[in-house]
């Protein structure tokens, strides 16, 4: 999770009364697993996905130049190349037009790079098995 840019009412989350690293980690895990949990309970997560897709389509169709957390193949953002990751991206008529590097804590950059390496390794294995 990227906590360095998270805020509530303009106050950095790490300074928010009652916020702890444990609470942040618990919240992250719950958010990460909630989609699967909703599907298990047969309530589905389709509405949220539909809203997100509508936002992206709207930004493209109207050349909205919206900053959205969309996945695209990285070409240097945070030193990452040839791996698809979700980062803040300007979305307009040309699709994912520009990725934006927000300031991250060093440990967040390292975690992002580890994620990129894991994705590249997994993709390599999938492609090797497909051939």
Language-model regions: role of each:
Residues 1-131:
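C-terminal substrate-binding/catalytic lobe of Rossmann-fold NAD(P)-dependent dehydrogenases
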